[in-house]
Amino acid sequence: AVADYKAKNYSNEKIKKTGDDLNLIFERDRDIIKTLRDMKENQILVGFAAESSNLKENAKGKLDRKNLDYIVANDISKSETGFASDENKVTIISKSGEEVSLEKMSKREVAKNIFDIIKGR
């Protein structure tokens, strides 16, 4: 997944260990969805919301704020699904308000289902 933040400074070489702590400063990364939305003509724009609380509320807010056609809401607070797992359980929400919840399945199956649901609309 693309991160919202990136390291402000980076080195092309190994950073040697010193006796001091190392502090990283992060800055906002570019908004890829905004860039794609600004170029959009007839494409269907799908975003992803990885959330640890208020899953549907936060996902719907992002759907509206970013003017997406669909958003795939992913609850990352569960250890058996999400980032640290090979399986996932998501809810696909359309801009018209339709919701399709997918049961826990492999991430490959989730991707296929997302594609099939959007293709079928």
Say what each PLM segment does.
Residues 68, 75, 80-121:
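Small-residue (G/A/S/T)-rich helix-start motifs and N-terminal tracts that mark the onset
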Residues 1-79:
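Glycine-rich phosphate/dinucleotide-binding loop and adjoining beta-alpha-beta core of small-molecule
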